[in-house]
C-alpha cells in the first residue's frame, strides 16, 4: 500500500455567460494539469526518473470538441452542469426514444450527459462542422480523452469504460458505441474515442519535457468511479458517497447491469483485465457549488472557510432552506426545467441564515 507524499492543485475558471451556460477552457485545463505535475515533482523531492506511471481521474460528462490533426479546440468545453442542450434532449424524448436509450445505456435521457452536448456542439458549428465530424476530422470526447490526446506524443484518442458509459452513447450490454443511438443524436461513431480498459496503457508522456524518458499513462477513471475504487468498494453491495461541486451516491452491483425503477442510473464502474463491473448511481447537480454561488454571486462570504463559523452562529430553529436546482434537478427527478428556490424566509432571516441554508435536494435525496 502506497502513501501520499504531496498534493497540489490549481483552479481553472468557471466561465458562465449571461444565459447561465457553463463552460471550461480546454487549453487552461491542459496547462494546469502540466503545471501541477511539475510543481508536485519539484515540491515532493521525487526524482522524475523514478515515476513509474501516471493515472487520470477526471470530471465526468464535461464535453469537448477539437481538431484531430491540430489538437485545437473548436469551442470551450460544455460543463456537466450546463443545460444548454436541454432542447435537444427534449427533441429526442418527443420522438419516443427515451426508454430505448435508458434500456441500452442505463441512463435517463437528459442534457446532463454528453450525447446532447455533443449534438449541440456539432449543430452550433453548422453543416461544415458536421461534415468534418463525419469525415473523421474531429474528436468529440470527455476531459479524460482530451488530456490523453494532449499528453501523449502520438495524440492517442482513447477513453475508458467508466467515462464512455456516461456519454449516453455507449451500450452497456454490447460494451460498444451504440450506432443507433449515435444516429439519433447525429453523432458519427468515427468522432468518438476508442474505449479501453481503465487499467490499460493509454500511451506515454514526457509531460512537456519534465521526464527524460516517456512515462506510461496507465490508468483512467471518471472521478466518481475513482472514488468508489479508492474507497475499496470492490464487491457488490459496497457503496460510497462523494460530496463535491455536485454529489454522487454510488453502489457497486457486480458484473451484471441492473436497471432501477426509482430514478437512479446504471453505469460501468470500470474495466479491468478484460472484465467490467457495473454501478447504480444517484447524482445531485449542485451541492458544494452552492458555496461558490454564495461567494462569487451573492458576495456573502469571501472564502469557503467562512461557512463553518457562520453555520455555528445560525439559529437552529430557522426553517429557511434552499432547493439548489440552478441547472434543474438530478436523481431521482431528472427535471431540467426546475429552478432554484429559497423557502421559509421570515423577518429574522439574515446573512447567517443564508449561508446556513439547508440544501434541500441534498438532505432529502442522500
Q: Which residue stretches match the model-derived regions?
A:
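N-terminal glycine/serine-rich phosphate-binding loop of ATP-dependent small-molecule kinases
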Residues: 1-75, 103, 211-219, 349
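A generic structural motif
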Residues: 10-13, 80, 264
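Short, acidic/turn-prone active-site loops that include or flank metal/cofactor-
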Residues: 15, 78-85, 246-247
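A conserved helix-loop-beta module that forms one wall/lid of the active-site cleft
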Residues: 179-200
Amino acid at each position: 500500500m502506497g502513501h501520499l507524499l504531496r498534493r497540489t492543485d490549481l483552479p481553472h475558471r468557471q466561465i458562465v455567460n449571461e444565459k447561465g451556460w457553463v463552460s471550461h477552457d480546454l487549453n487552461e485545463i491542459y496547462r494546469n494539469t502540466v503545471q501541477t505535475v511539475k510543481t508536485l515533482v519539484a515540491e515532493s523531492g521525487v526524482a522524475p526518473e523514478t515515476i513509474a506511471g501516471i493515472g487520470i481521474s477526471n470530471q465526468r460528462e464535461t464535453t469537448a470538441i477539437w481538431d484531430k490533426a491540430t489538437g485545437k479546440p473548436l469551442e470551450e468545453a460544455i460543463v456537466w452542469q450546463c443545460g444548454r442542450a436541454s432542447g435537444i434532449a427534449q427533441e429526442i424524448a418527443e420522438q419516443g426514444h427515451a426508454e430505448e436509450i435508458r434500456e441500452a445505456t442505463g441512463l435517463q435521457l437528459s442534457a446532463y450527459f454528453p450525447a446532447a452536448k455533443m449534438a449541440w456542439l456539432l449543430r452550433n458549428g453548422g453543416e461544415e462542422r458536421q461534415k468534418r465530424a463525419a469525415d473523421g476530422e474531429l474528436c468529440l470526447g470527455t476531459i479524460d480523452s482530451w488530456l490523453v490526446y494532449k499528453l501523449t506524443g502520438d495524440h492517442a484518442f482513447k477513453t475508458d469504460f467508466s467515462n464512455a458509459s456516461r456519454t449516453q452513447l455507449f451500450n452497456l450490454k454490447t460494451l460498444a458505441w451504440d450506432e443507433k443511438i449515435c444516429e439519433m443524436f447525429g453523432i458519427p461513431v468515427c468522432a468518438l474515442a476508442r474505449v479501453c480498459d481503465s487499467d490499460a496503457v493509454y500511451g506515454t508522456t514526457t509531460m512537456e519535457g519534465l521526464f527524460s524518458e516517456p512515462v506510461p499513462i496507465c490508468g483512467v477513471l471518471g472521478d466518481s468511479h475513482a472514488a468508489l475504487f479508492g474507497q475499496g468498494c470492490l464487491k457488490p453491495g459496497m457503496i460510497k458517497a462523494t460530496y463535491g461541486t455536485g454529489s454522487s451516491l454510488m453502489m457497486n452491483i457486480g458484473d451484471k447491469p441492473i436497471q432501477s425503477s426509482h430514478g437512479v442510473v446504471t453505469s460501468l464502474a470500470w474495466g479491468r483485465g478484460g472484465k467490467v463491473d457495473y454501478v447504480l448511481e444517484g447524482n445531485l447537480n449542485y451541492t458544494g457549488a452552492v458555496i461558490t454561488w454564495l461567494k462569487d454571486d451573492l458576495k456573502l462570504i469571501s472564502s469557503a472557510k467562512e461557512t463553518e463559523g457562520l453555520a455555528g452562529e445560525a439559529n437552529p430553529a430557522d426553517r429557511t432552506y434552499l432547493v439548489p436546482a440552478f441547472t434543474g434537478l438530478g436523481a431521482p427527478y431528472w427535471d431540467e426545467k426546475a429552478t432554484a428556490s429559497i423557502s421559509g424566509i421570515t423577518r429574522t432571516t439574515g446573512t447567517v441564515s443564508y449561508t446556513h441554508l439547508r440544501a434541500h435536494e441534498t438532505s432529502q435525496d442522500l
